[in-house]
């Protein structure tokens, strides 16, 4: 089974939300390694929120601020590749925006070869264009690696009808369609990512990634998180 895991940049950082936290990164490696060892083929799209925040770039034009963010995802991807390999895992980085020794251009034959050798695919640089989120990039890259499931790794155990951090009476919604999520105004992903999921027939699973073992449970079909399906 092929799966694209969407990680936020903040997932790599500690409580301060900046830079790289060794304990947090080691946790990510442990969770990803557990699913690779079970035979799942994994792709990853990571954000850059641990390196750059939109508010810090507010004096720039949006296009240039987005370009800085895209480069931040490359930095995070190179970091992850090194950590994965030092943990005994194979990993390859694909991007359309940079030419570095450790970064390959997106190539479908190369992606298939990497998956056959059980390499983790790390997709850097978003969609390669400004104005698109890493959510949209995750769906696009899932299609390129022929995955029909995107796992959105969050700190919340699924989709709720309102913010559970602000509203104690928030109710979890274990299963819904993209149209329902959009109609309810739920911010699971942005509208462009939703539209692409609907068009391509890709399912999104929202989980609390930081509950140990939840990723593996989700991929094995156990009742964790929330599932958003095409209409």
Curated annotation (Swiss-Prot):
- Residues recorded as binding UMP, renumbered to this chain, are 66, 127-134
Name the EC number(s). Answer: 2.7.4.22
- Which keywords, in A-to-Z order, does the entry hold? Allosteric enzyme, ATP-binding, Cytoplasm, Kinase, Nucleotide-binding, Pyrimidine biosynthesis, Transferase
Localization, per the record, is: Cytoplasm
Highest taxon above the source species? Bacteria
- Pfam families named among the record's database cross-references: AA_kinase (PF00696)
- What's the name of the protein? Uridylate kinase
GO BP annotation list: 'de novo' CTP biosynthetic process; UDP biosynthetic process
**KW Kinase (keyword) present:** yes
Q: Which residues bind ATP?
A: 6-9, 49, 53, 154, 160, 163
* Reactions it catalyzes: UMP + ATP = UDP + ADP
Recorded hits in CDD domains, A to Z, give: AAK_UMPK-PyrH-Ec
Tell me, what does this protein do in biology? Catalyzes the reversible phosphorylation of UMP to UDP.
Q: In which pathway does it act?
A: Pyrimidine metabolism; CTP biosynthesis via de novo pathway; UDP from UMP (UMPK route): step 1/1
EC category name: transferase
């Amino acid at each position: 089974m092929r799966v694209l895991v969407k990680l936020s940049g903040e997932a790599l950082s500690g409580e301060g939300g900046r830079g790289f936290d060794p304990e947090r990164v080691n946790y990510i490696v442990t969770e990803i390694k557990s699913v690779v060892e079970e035979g799942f083929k994994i792709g990853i799209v990571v954000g850059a929120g641990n390196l750059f925040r939109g508010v810090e770039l507010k004096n720039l034009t949006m296009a240039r601020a987005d370009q800085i963010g895209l480069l931040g995802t490359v930095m995070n991807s190179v970091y992850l590749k090194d950590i994965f390999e030092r943990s005994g895992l194979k990993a390859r980085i694909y991007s359309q925006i940079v030419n570095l020794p450790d970064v390959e251009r997106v190539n479908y034959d190369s992606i298939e070869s990497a998956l056959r050798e059980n390499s983790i695919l790390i997709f850097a640089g978003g969609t390669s264009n400004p104005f698109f989120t890493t959510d949209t990039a995750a769906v696009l890259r899932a299609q390129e690696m022929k995955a029909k499931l995107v796992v959105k790794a969050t700190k919340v155990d699924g989709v709720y009808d309102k913010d559970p951090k602000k509203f104690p009476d928030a109710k979890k919604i274990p299963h819904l369609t993209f149209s329902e999520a959009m109609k309810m105004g739920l911010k699971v992903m942005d509208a462009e990512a939703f539209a692409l999921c609907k068009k391509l027939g890709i399912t999104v699973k929202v989980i609390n990634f930081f509950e140990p073992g939840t990723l593996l449970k989700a991929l094995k079909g156990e009742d964790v998180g929330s599932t958003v399906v095409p209409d």
